[in-house]
Amino acid sequence: MSNKFKGMIWLRGQVTLANKSILLQVFMPIFLIFLYKFIFSLNGAGKEIGADKLATMLLTISLPFSLAMSVGTPIIIILAEEREKHNLQSLRLAGVTAGQYILSALIWPAIIGIFYIVITPLLVGAKLSNQLFSYSLVLLLTMLVLIFFFLMVGLFCKNQVMAQSLSVPAMLLAAFIPMFSNMSEDLSKVLRYSFMGLFSSYMKDWSHFHLWSGEFLALVVWLLLFAGLSFYLMRHLQILDD
């Protein structure tokens, strides 16, 4: 690992810690999870549908929001800030490649995403003892696709104003697709091939879930598409050279 790459990872960590707005978005999902639990407890949902189904429902609602808010939005804001302040040109002159830049942008979001993948089931009381492998695989793949999706959006933003305008729709899109999939069978058939389709299908019935499916292949296609577009934007905008 080169010193430039280590320095960029360290710098992004410092930017995250120094920006209170980003820190708030990173930790806000924990508050929202407890808020969801409180609201459902007031409605007596646990007694009506059972504790296990309630935990699964909370997991389905909480995880997309947690990943989109704590991982996605900070990516967009940080990239837009770097572009607005012309930090990218300085990195280019320092010899940082597009690959190094994109990879350094993935490290901290991946760490934060893994944190929420681990802690969310514990907070909602979901029992995953027999589903640890499939849960980990589905969520890690989904997280990686989301990171590249928000990275693509962030590279598209020219300034922080544009980032604020696009981050909310992007976050809501990622968060609400699983909810829309559960609203009707027709929507489910369409959205099953979206970049949140594998997650939605898994959360509907993880006990009978099969990884090698159309949803899995669609997710791989989305991953390649978002990653390819991210590198294309780097080249097209002439931010960094390979």
Model-based region annotation:
Residues 1-28:
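Aromatic- and glycine-rich beta-strand/loop motifs that create alpha-glucan
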Residues 18-43, 58-74, 166-178, 218-227:
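Hydrophobic alpha-helical transmembrane segments of multi-pass membrane transport/permease proteins
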Residues 20, 140-177:
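A structural motif at transmembrane helix-loop-helix junctions in multipass membrane proteins
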Residues 41-53, 124-129, 203-205:
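Membrane-interface helix termini and inter-helical loops of multi-pass transporters
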Residues 54-93, 97-121:
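Hydrophobic alpha-helical transmembrane segments of multi-pass membrane transport proteins
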Residues 89, 220-242:
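Junction motif at the cytosolic side of a transmembrane helix
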Residues 98-99, 106-158:
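Alpha-helical transmembrane segments and their short interhelical loops
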Residues 178-224, 228:
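Terminal transmembrane helical anchor/hairpin motif
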